[in-house]
Protein backbone atom coordinates (compact mmCIF):
# COMPACT_ATOMS: atom_id res chain seq x y z
CA UNK A 1 0.00 0.00 0.00
CA UNK A 2 1.06 3.60 -0.34
CA UNK A 3 1.44 4.40 3.36
CA UNK A 4 2.89 2.77 6.45
CA UNK A 5 0.85 4.73 9.02
CA UNK A 6 -2.89 5.20 9.50
CA UNK A 7 -2.55 8.92 8.81
CA UNK A 8 -0.66 8.29 5.58
CA UNK A 9 -3.23 5.69 4.55
CA UNK A 10 -6.07 8.17 5.02
CA UNK A 11 -4.20 10.98 3.22
CA UNK A 12 -3.53 8.65 0.29
CA UNK A 13 -7.24 7.84 0.02
CA UNK A 14 -8.20 11.53 0.04
CA UNK A 15 -6.16 12.38 -3.07
CA UNK A 16 -7.40 12.06 -6.65
CA UNK A 17 -5.39 11.01 -9.68
CA UNK A 18 -4.83 14.58 -10.89
CA UNK A 19 -3.39 15.65 -14.24
CA UNK A 20 -2.85 19.30 -15.00
CA UNK A 21 -0.61 22.26 -15.61
CA UNK A 22 2.21 22.43 -13.10
CA UNK A 23 3.48 25.82 -11.81
CA UNK A 24 6.49 25.66 -14.18
CA UNK A 25 4.10 25.54 -17.18
CA UNK A 26 4.54 21.87 -18.02
CA UNK A 27 1.74 19.30 -17.86
CA UNK A 28 1.87 16.18 -15.72
CA UNK A 29 0.48 14.18 -12.84
CA UNK A 30 0.39 15.61 -9.33
CA UNK A 31 2.47 13.59 -6.89
CA UNK A 32 1.06 15.27 -3.78
CA UNK A 33 -1.98 17.19 -2.63
CA UNK A 34 0.10 20.40 -2.68
CA UNK A 35 0.99 19.88 -6.36
CA UNK A 36 -2.65 19.20 -7.19
CA UNK A 37 -3.69 22.40 -5.41
CA UNK A 38 -0.99 24.41 -7.23
CA UNK A 39 -2.43 23.29 -10.58
CA UNK A 40 -5.49 25.42 -9.90
CA UNK A 41 -8.20 25.51 -12.55
CA UNK A 42 -6.27 23.38 -15.06
CA UNK A 43 -6.40 20.24 -12.95
CA UNK A 44 -8.36 17.22 -14.15
CA UNK A 45 -9.25 14.40 -11.79
CA UNK A 46 -8.77 11.50 -14.17
CA UNK A 47 -10.16 8.89 -11.79
CA UNK A 48 -13.42 10.83 -11.42
CA UNK A 49 -13.69 11.49 -15.15
CA UNK A 50 -12.92 7.87 -15.98
CA UNK A 51 -15.49 6.45 -13.56
CA UNK A 52 -18.11 8.95 -14.72
CA UNK A 53 -17.65 7.93 -18.36
CA UNK A 54 -17.49 4.21 -17.50
CA UNK A 55 -20.69 4.36 -15.44
CA UNK A 56 -22.42 6.34 -18.20
CA UNK A 57 -21.47 3.62 -20.68
CA UNK A 58 -22.70 0.92 -18.28
CA UNK A 59 -26.01 2.80 -18.01
CA UNK A 60 -26.33 2.93 -21.80
CA UNK A 61 -25.40 -0.74 -22.17
CA UNK A 62 -27.91 -1.93 -19.55
CA UNK A 63 -30.78 0.11 -20.95
CA UNK A 64 -29.93 -0.90 -24.52
CA UNK A 65 -29.91 -4.59 -23.54
CA UNK A 66 -33.27 -4.15 -21.80
CA UNK A 67 -34.73 -2.36 -24.83
CA UNK A 68 -33.53 -5.04 -27.27
CA UNK A 69 -34.90 -7.89 -25.14
CA UNK A 70 -38.16 -6.13 -24.22
CA UNK A 71 -41.33 -8.16 -24.73
CA UNK A 72 -44.96 -7.29 -24.17
CA UNK A 73 -45.81 -10.79 -22.96
CA UNK A 74 -43.73 -12.02 -20.05
CA UNK A 75 -40.97 -9.54 -19.12
CA UNK A 76 -37.68 -10.76 -17.69
CA UNK A 77 -35.85 -9.51 -14.63
CA UNK A 78 -33.82 -6.80 -16.38
CA UNK A 79 -36.89 -5.47 -18.18
CA UNK A 80 -38.81 -5.36 -14.88
CA UNK A 81 -35.94 -3.49 -13.20
CA UNK A 82 -35.73 -0.90 -15.99
CA UNK A 83 -39.52 -0.49 -16.08
CA UNK A 84 -39.63 0.11 -12.32
CA UNK A 85 -36.93 2.78 -12.62
CA UNK A 86 -38.66 4.45 -15.58
CA UNK A 87 -42.06 4.41 -13.82
CA UNK A 88 -40.54 5.80 -10.61
CA UNK A 89 -38.84 8.69 -12.41
CA UNK A 90 -41.88 9.32 -14.62
CA UNK A 91 -44.13 9.50 -11.53
CA UNK A 92 -41.71 11.84 -9.76
CA UNK A 93 -41.57 14.14 -12.80
CA UNK A 94 -45.37 14.21 -13.15
CA UNK A 95 -45.77 15.04 -9.44
CA UNK A 96 -43.25 17.90 -9.47
CA UNK A 97 -43.39 19.28 -13.04
CA UNK A 98 -46.86 20.00 -14.37
CA UNK A 99 -45.86 21.42 -17.75
CA UNK A 100 -45.27 19.52 -20.98
CA UNK A 101 -41.66 18.99 -22.06
CA UNK A 102 -40.13 16.04 -23.93
CA UNK A 103 -36.75 16.69 -22.27
CA UNK A 104 -37.50 16.68 -18.53
CA UNK A 105 -38.35 12.98 -17.98
CA UNK A 106 -35.41 11.54 -20.00
CA UNK A 107 -33.03 13.99 -18.32
CA UNK A 108 -34.38 13.07 -14.88
CA UNK A 109 -34.03 9.35 -15.69
CA UNK A 110 -30.44 9.84 -16.85
CA UNK A 111 -29.47 11.80 -13.74
CA UNK A 112 -31.25 9.35 -11.43
CA UNK A 113 -29.61 6.24 -12.92
CA UNK A 114 -26.18 7.87 -13.14
CA UNK A 115 -26.26 8.95 -9.48
CA UNK A 116 -27.63 5.51 -8.54
CA UNK A 117 -24.71 3.80 -10.30
CA UNK A 118 -22.14 6.22 -8.84
CA UNK A 119 -23.44 5.48 -5.35
CA UNK A 120 -23.51 1.74 -6.10
CA UNK A 121 -19.72 1.90 -6.49
CA UNK A 122 -19.66 2.54 -2.71
CA UNK A 123 -20.56 -1.13 -2.27
CA UNK A 124 -17.14 -2.17 -3.61
CA UNK A 125 -14.53 -2.27 -0.81
CA UNK A 126 -12.48 0.93 -0.75
CA UNK A 127 -9.13 -0.74 -1.54
CA UNK A 128 -10.07 -3.13 -4.36
CA UNK A 129 -10.17 -0.70 -7.28
CA UNK A 130 -7.09 1.31 -6.19
CA UNK A 131 -5.22 -2.00 -5.86
CA UNK A 132 -6.28 -2.83 -9.42
CA UNK A 133 -4.97 0.59 -10.53
CA UNK A 134 -1.66 -0.18 -8.78
CA UNK A 135 -1.42 -3.54 -10.58
CA UNK A 136 -2.14 -1.95 -13.96
CA UNK A 137 0.13 1.09 -13.56
CA UNK A 138 2.94 -0.56 -11.61
CA UNK A 139 3.14 2.55 -9.38
CA UNK A 140 2.50 1.64 -5.71
CA UNK A 141 1.89 5.31 -4.82
CA UNK A 142 -0.76 6.08 -7.46
CA UNK A 143 -3.66 8.03 -5.93
CA UNK A 144 -6.92 6.60 -7.25
CA UNK A 145 -10.44 7.11 -5.94
CA UNK A 146 -13.22 4.96 -7.32
CA UNK A 147 -16.13 6.81 -5.73
CA UNK A 148 -16.91 9.75 -7.99
CA UNK A 149 -19.54 11.22 -5.68
CA UNK A 150 -16.88 12.19 -3.11
CA UNK A 151 -15.17 14.57 -5.54
CA UNK A 152 -16.46 18.15 -5.17
CA UNK A 153 -15.17 19.16 -8.62
UniProtKB/Swiss-Prot annotation:
The answer to whether keyword Ubl conjugation applies is: no
Recorded topology in the membrane? Multi-pass membrane protein
Predominant place of localization? membrane
Name of the protein: ATP synthase subunit a
Q: Which family does it belong to?
A: Belongs to the ATPase A chain family.
Record key words, sorted = ATP synthesis, Cell inner membrane, Cell membrane, CF(0), Hydrogen ion transport, Ion transport, Membrane, Transmembrane, Transmembrane helix, Transport
Any one GO molecular-function label of the UniProt entry: proton-transporting ATP synthase activity, rotational mechanism
Subcellular location as annotated: Cell inner membrane
The task this protein performs is described as: Key component of the proton channel; it plays a direct role in the translocation of protons across the membrane.
Q: Which SUPFAM superfamilies match?
A: F1F0 ATP synthase subunit A (SSF81336)
List all membrane-crossing ranges: 43-63, 104-124
Q: Which domain of life is it from?
A: Bacteria
PANTHER family in the cross-refs: ATP SYNTHASE SUBUNIT A, CHLOROPLASTIC
Q: Which InterPro entries match?
A: ATP_syn_F0_a_bact/chloroplast, ATP_synth_F0_asu, F0_ATP_A_sf
Task: Provide one Gene Ontology biological process annotation.
Answer: proton motive force-driven plasma membrane ATP synthesis
The Gene Ontology CC terms held by the record are: plasma membrane; proton-transporting ATP synthase complex
What does the subunit section of this Swiss-Prot or TrEMBL entry state? F-type ATPases have 2 components, CF(1) - the catalytic core - and CF(0) - the membrane proton channel. CF(1) has five subunits: alpha(3), beta(3), gamma(1), delta(1), epsilon(1). CF(0) has three main subunits: a(1), b(2) and c(9-12). The alpha and beta chains form an alternating ring which encloses part of the gamma chain. CF(1) is attached to CF(0) by a central stalk formed by the gamma and epsilon chains, while a peripheral stalk is formed by the delta and b chains.
Amino acid sequence: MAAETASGYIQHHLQNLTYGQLPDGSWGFAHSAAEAKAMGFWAFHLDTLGWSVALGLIFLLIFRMAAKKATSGQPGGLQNFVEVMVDFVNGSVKDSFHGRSPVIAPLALTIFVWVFLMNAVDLIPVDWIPQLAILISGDPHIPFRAVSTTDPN
